[in-house]
A protein has these predicted regions:
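Long, contiguous binding/interaction regions
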Residues: 1-77
Length: 77
């Protein structure tokens, strides 16, 4: 397993329900989740995970395919 942080920018709030479904699906790998609202529309969310790299990549890819949501993962060495 690897430790990773996935940074998520949500620009389309109507997609948050789909995002939450994905986070629930991968919940057993999520160590911590935190976020803030810098503007009225955009959300910034960070997810810390302890999971196999393929699992982290899969979640990051699924999140990134949601309309108006961007995601990038940063891994421990």
């Amino acid at each position: 397993n690897r430790i990773a942080v996935i940074g998520i920018i949500v620009e389309e709030p109507q997609e948050v329900e789909k995002l939450n479904q994905l986070l629930h699906e991968y919940g057993s790998y999520i160590i911590e989740e935190w976020g803030f609202l810098p503007g009225e529309k955009d959300h910034v969310i960070s997810i810390a995970m302890d999971a196999p790299q393929d699992t982290i990549n899969a979640l990051t890819g699924k999140i990134g395919r949601l309309e108006g949501i961007s995601a990038k993962a940063v891994y421990s060495k």
